[in-house]
């Protein structure tokens, strides 16, 4: 089920942080009501490992969201994970 919803007012995009398995987290990004990204695992990390905290999933989800809104390439790198202190 959905754990938290972060709505960006005056914007057509929204981020949802979701529970993955028993103890992990992922995120979904919607454009209005259309689901455009489902990310149940930490990107660019080998193996299918979910984020360890709501904060990590929210942080990376927000970075992707900001890049999408800016019209930029939104792929995540290991440097992004390191810069934001995401545990992987």
For the regions a protein language model found, what residue spans apply to each?
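Compositionally biased, low-complexity repeat tracts
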Residues: 20, 45, 67-69
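A short, exposed loop/beta-hairpin motif centered on an aromatic-Gly-Thr core
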Residues: 38-54
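Short N-terminal "domain-start" leader segments
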Residues: 1-30
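Short amphipathic alpha-helical segments, especially helix-boundary/capping motifs
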Residues: 2-3, 37-38, 57
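Intrinsically disordered, low-complexity charged/polar segments
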Residues: 76-88
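A short, structured beta-strand/loop element
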Residues: 24-42
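A short, charged, amphipathic alpha-helix used as a generic interaction element across diverse proteins
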Residues: 51-69
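A short, polar/charged loop-to-alpha-helix boundary motif
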Residues: 72
